[in-house]
Amino acid sequence: MSNIAPQVLRHASRACSRRLSLSASLVRPAYSARTVTGSGSGGRRYVSGSQRHNAQAQTTVESAVKTEQKASVPGTAVTGDALANPSAGILKQATIMDEGNRPIYLDMQATTPTDPRVLDAMLPFLTGLYGNPHSRTHAYGWETEKATEQARSHVATLIGADPKEIIFTSGATESNNMSIKGVARFFGRSGKKKHIITTQTEHKCVLDSCRHLQDEGFEVTYLPVQSNGLIKIEDLEAAIRPETALVSIMTVNNEIGVIQPMKEIGALCRSKKVFFHTDAAQAVGKIPVDVNEWNVDLMSISGHKLYGPKGIGACYVRRRPRVRIDPLITGGGQERGLRSGTLAPPLVVGFGEACRLAKEEMEYDSKRISALSQRLLTSLLALEHTTLNGDPNRHYPGCVNVSFAYVEGESLLMALKDIALSSGSACTSASLEPSYVLRALGNSDESAHSSIRFGIGRFTTESEIDYVIKAVKERVTFLRELSPLWELVQEGVDLNTIEWSQH
């Protein structure tokens, strides 16, 4: 970390404290009338009636603070405006912290950076607009309720749903648990619907939810996938039976990026009168999603996977035909009784704004990410013994999973310490076991261990991709030269014919 960063942070803290104390002393008429005015960020704030004559003094304070900040941090690329205004300064955050020493970020499947425009939308609800959105007897509650309902509408519009079908949760993990356990327990009480179908390549929270239900007496069928990561519709149709309550199949896989045939799956489930749930955390905001066209009954969405804040997500629950679920969290009956607890307006508003931006900019983002992905993939596959994991056609371009034969994935990650990458799901990254997703594709342990996932997103640049290509080629070549297996391969030896002795 840069040695100037502590100085910057201490000074910014002092400046902020000084500004707040001066504001408090300048504007403190007791019991003065309040009016609602517009704010520069598009939100609303309460101001006292006597604040008008203090406006000039407040402007002077702001100007003095910025001037002092500029003078106190010479040599940085951060302006006083950026330090005083968090929304302006977020794009310079890396400069403040490390002066350019942070790795290139290519782990977009783990999380995405918060879009600065999302932060702009959130800021008023972290300060002046602090009402409980469920308090309907005064203006503080009304204004936050209006904002949360607008956010709900943005989420619904993104997936072609009705706003009343959107239930806010803490994220996709909760939404997956809520959907799978909720439907299974509601319809399993009769004892007639105690069968669930999912795939072997689902996210860990889906697989764990199914295992918990198995402990409760439910039967679960784990469908295999083909070598390209896609299921066979024939296998799904054969697995459905009269006691099947739910089919849960993710839209875009978080490790290999394959896109399952959602229309065909949804049509089959609807014809068999079986509820269809999909974990769409890696799809919503990145590819076109329509719950009605796909005949989806339940869908899990995550805010931080589409440039929104962490800790917020949504569960789409269809109203017609109605889907009945047992809630996981009970209490005050918020969110139509399906998810009790007070909503966090800053997170909800940020999530809604992220969805609005995703809808508005999806076509542009998609074309740009596709071009960067093709540039990366073409160069990487030019290396010997390098393969793309997953179907090359039914594939989200922002997720590129490549196996580099005769190179240990963990060694390559360490060699690429200037690039933030992953060898698989962030939820299983602490495990040294080979990826269960790649194993389900039929990959060997060696192939699974040699895989690296490249995540490309909205803020990835062409120069970053070019740097990554150069670095990967150099370091893969270097690591292979250290491997005795690579030497044998170069000599034309078939490693499968070697009988290895054990000591």
From Swiss-Prot:
[2Fe-2S] cluster binds at C427. Residues 34-58 are annotated as: Disordered. The active site is at C427 (cysteine persulfide intermediate). Disulfide bonds: none annotated. It is found in: Mitochondrion. Pfam families: Aminotran_5. It comes from the Eukaryota. The keyword Phosphoprotein does not apply. Residues 1-27 form a transit peptide. Its cofactor is pyridoxal 5'-phosphate. Pyridoxal 5'-phosphate binds at A172, T173, N254, Q282, S302, G303, H304, T342. It is an enzyme of class 2 (transferase). Residues 34-50 have a biased composition (Low complexity). Its main location: mitochondrion. One of its GO terms (biological process) is [2Fe-2S] cluster assembly. Catalyzes the removal of elemental sulfur from cysteine to produce alanine. It supplies the inorganic sulfur for iron-sulfur (Fe-S) clusters. Plays a role in both tRNA-processing and mitochondrial metabolism. Involved in the 2-thio-modification of both 5-carboxymethylaminomethyl-2-thiouridine in mitochondrial tRNAs and 5-methoxycarbonylmethyl-2-thiouridine (mcm5s2U) in cytoplasmic tRNAs. Belongs to the class-V pyridoxal-phosphate-dependent aminotransferase family. NifS/IscS subfamily. This is Cysteine desulfurase, mitochondrial. It comes from Arthroderma benhamiae (strain ATCC MYA-4681 / CBS 112371). The lineage of its organism: Eukaryota, Fungi, Dikarya, Ascomycota, Pezizomycotina.
